[in-house]
Design a protein with these regions (language model features):
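Sec-dependent signal peptide recognition
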Residues: 2-9
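Thiol-/selenol-based redox modules, centered on thioredoxin-like
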Residues: 139-198
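Structural microenvironment flanking redox-active thiols in thiol-disulfide oxidoreductases
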Residues: 65-109, 120-125, 198
Length: 198
């Protein structure tokens, strides 16, 4: 585990001159398909109307797993008020992302919120990342009730505030007070579906 983590850190710092350019905010969250260990798929838009915090993580990264536990605490406390934590694992050199691995970390860390996985291409597209851009891991994205991205980790070294529990609470408090979108507004958005993969 330590060897894999060291390799990931080395790879992340191998091209210091290149970085993920800051994406404009707020901006509408793109759609994202999340694969669940059960074989079902869930669209990110299924959570519209809630304040969503997504962590894109490497399963082999202890730091990513610590952030996942932070989101678990926030979900348990703030979930009734409209917070939805989501974790999405994706592959890295020396670190796969699949149903059995996701199931293992969910049970090991006792995570109570949705945890799934996807491929690196889908993550890059969602984050608007170019192939040569250095991606800070974990990537934490905060989406408001209307589906707008209000905060994102971005380029290395990222935004430590999005990995800190107290800072996240401060950021989330006003978002949770915002009014959820009306039913009419929701009808103008693409419908989210949950289905079994083939």
């Amino acid at each position: 585990m330590r060897k894999i983590t060291s390799v990931l850190v080395l790879l992340a710092s191998a091209i210091p001159g290149l970085a993920l350019p800051p994406a404009p905010m707020p901006r509408r969250s793109p759609e994202l398909t999340i694969y669940e260990p059960s074989g079902k798929t869930t669209l990110l838009s299924a959570f519209r109307g809630k304040v969503v915090v997504i962590e894109f993580l490497f399963i082999a990264s202890p730091h990513c797993l610590r952030v996942a536990q932070t989101l678990n605490r926030l979900e348990q406390e703030l979930g009734p008020g409209g917070l939805q934590s989501v974790a999405v694992a994706f592959p890295a050199p020396g670190s796969d992302a699949n149903g059995p691995l996701v199931t293992y970390i969910v049970h090991d860390l006792k995570l109570t919120y949705p945890v799934g996985y996807t491929d690196s291409t889908s993550v890059d597209k969602y984050l608007e990342r170019g192939r040569a851009d250095v991606l800070n891991i974990p990537q934490v994205v905060v989406i408001d009730r209307s589906g707008m991205i209000r905060a994102q980790s971005g380029a290395k070294p990222g935004d430590p505030k999005l990995e800190d529990e107290a800072s996240l609470r401060h950021l989330l408090a006003p978002l949770l007070k915002e009014t959820p979108p009306s039913d009419n507004a929701a009808k103008t958005e693409p419908l989210a579906t949950t289905r079994k993969t083939q």
